[in-house]
């Protein structure tokens, strides 16, 4: 699996140190093992996980600004854990409302010795942002409107919302509530992944 990951990274033009590659593979191993009992992802093939979960997450990293992030509705740690592995100088709070997912995240934290993640079991509306975050990240979590309505209290003054989407979500963008604007839409390239991927970066219009 390490060779497959290395080829995918080469195809994407991404260079990672060997220990980070080993951590990413170990995470996929754990996800595959726990998935049999906990049903954490619909993806069953570890090599497919490398494409649809690992590469699909880490291609976002160059576009993140800041060092304190929260991954809302993280599920089994996506995109938060792959991002934490490749961005060790940043901290990621991984938020999910389901206990089985958070238990898995804590086991990943323990086995991979990730000291830059904090798994939390909470609903996003009830989670305090003290201090506020530089970025609020979501992947397959909610519509853009729901994301900013539920998470509006989380980013700091210069903080941003980072929504990982498939096709460009023009309908969701046009339905954004007043007070929020699109700062950038990035078309992402993920090797061996069918379909489009976009990163929508939003910012609150603070007066």
Swiss-Prot record:
Any one GO molecular-function label of the UniProt entry: rRNA (guanine-N7-)-methyltransferase activity
Binding residues for S-adenosyl-L-methionine: 73, 78, 124-125, 139
CDD domains (alphabetical): AdoMet_MTases
Superkingdom of the source species: Bacteria
Enzyme Commission number(s): 2.1.1.170
Localization terms from the record: Cytoplasm
Main location: cytoplasm
Recorded GO CC terms: cytosol
Any one Pfam family match given in the protein's UniProt record, by short name: GidB
Matches recorded under InterPro entries: rRNA_ssu_MeTfrase_G (IPR003682), SAM-dependent_MTases_sf (IPR029063)
SUPFAM superfamilies to which the protein is assigned, alphabetical: S-adenosyl-L-methionine-dependent methyltransferases (SSF53335)
Assigned keywords, A-Z: Cytoplasm, Methyltransferase, rRNA processing, S-adenosyl-L-methionine, Transferase
PANTHER family found in the cross-reference section: S-ADENOSYL-L-METHIONINE-DEPENDENT METHYLTRANSFERASES SUPERFAMILY PROTEIN
Family: Belongs to the methyltransferase superfamily. RNA methyltransferase RsmG family.
Function, as annotated: Specifically methylates the N7 position of guanine in position 527 of 16S rRNA.
Listed HAMAP family: 16SrRNA_methyltr_G
Name of this chain's protein: Ribosomal RNA small subunit methyltransferase G
Organism: Cronobacter sakazakii (strain ATCC BAA-894)
